[in-house]
Design a protein with these regions (language model features):
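Catalytic-core "active-site belt" of small-molecule-metabolizing enzymes
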Residues: 2-207, 235-242, 247-260
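A conserved acidic, glycine/proline-rich C-terminal tail/linker
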Residues: 202-238
């Protein structure tokens, strides 16, 4: 394993304001090597006292779809300490660079009744409207394999209230709103995205994730959260954000604040 690259990515995980060695951070590694490096980063977080809280499946939507090649879907990990409840408040400056992204969040149920080992669908207990908090730690121009090693930019996830998973997620429409400070509660619509032709089938993504994790020595566990791809997104700024998911999934809210509220 490329230990210099692991060390450089770890330093960025701990402090994204670090300036990495360009020769190290821009090595052209494969997505598979990046996946193993990412798991080494996870191991360092676990050794540092953090807890694994779930997973994400990447390259499933929008411009990033198939960025590593047709059907290539790397995974990323979610730290439990950064799985936040609805209406979470996060200090903007602690996030460095990045943005909020509306994502559907799934909750893994008991393994009984799951057929994921046969390439089937994992047992999912429910889903919720969600936000992924993405932190841009890498400098521009880094190869895709390095992006995988950097955990696909994940910082954390905010999830709304759990509901039963609708059967017709291909019809899902998601709208992102923001309210800026000083606008007296006036909410602005940022954009609206529909599942159809934008994102991989969510159930297929869950199957792919389960198979990918198994190939790398991991598996979905009861209570874990899973996100499956971005809908609308917006760069970080001090503001209140709300995502509305139709099909009776509901809303999720997060506030990026200038100070601790």
């Amino acid at each position: 394993m490329n230990q210099k690259l692991v060390d450089a990515l770890w330093k960025l995980q701990v402090d994204p304001s670090n300036t990495p060695n360009a020769e190290v951070i821009k090595q052209n590694i494969s997505a598979e090597e990046g996946q193993w490096i990412q798991l080494e980063i996870l191991e360092r977080w676990l050794n540092d006292g953090k807890t694994l809280g779930g997973w994400k499946i990447g390259m499933t939507s929008g411009e990033s779809r198939d960025a590593l090649g047709p059907g290539v879907r790397p995974f990323g990990f979610l730290l439990k300490e950064r799985l936040l409840n609805n209406r979470a408040q996060i200090i903007r400056d602690q996030l460095y660079r990045g943005g909020v992204e509306n994502e559907l969040c799934f909750f893994v149920g008991p393994s009984e009744g799951s057929d994921e080992t046969d390439g089937g669908l994992p047992n999912i207990a429910g889903c919720a409207a969600g936000f992924e908090i993405n932190q841009k730690r890498l400098p521009p121009g880094c190869p895709a394999g390095v992006r995988v090693g950097d955990n696909l930019s994940n910082w954390g996830v905010v999830a709304g209230h759990a509901v039963e998973v609708p059967k017709n997620l291909e019809d899902l429409s998601v709208t992102l709103f923001k309210t800026e400070p000083g606008r007296r509660g006036k909410e602005l619509e940022i954009g609206r995205v529909k599942s159809n032709d934008h994102i991989d089938d969510h159930f297929d993504s869950l199957r792919v994730l389960a198979a990918r994790l198994e190939a790398f020595g991991h598996r979905l566990q009861e209570g874990q959260w899973v996100i499956t791809g971005a809908y609308e997104k917006h760069p970080f700024e001090v503001a209140h954000f709300r995502g509305h998911f139709d099909l009776e999934i509901g809303d999720v809210e997060v506030s990026l604040t200038s100070t601790q509220q």
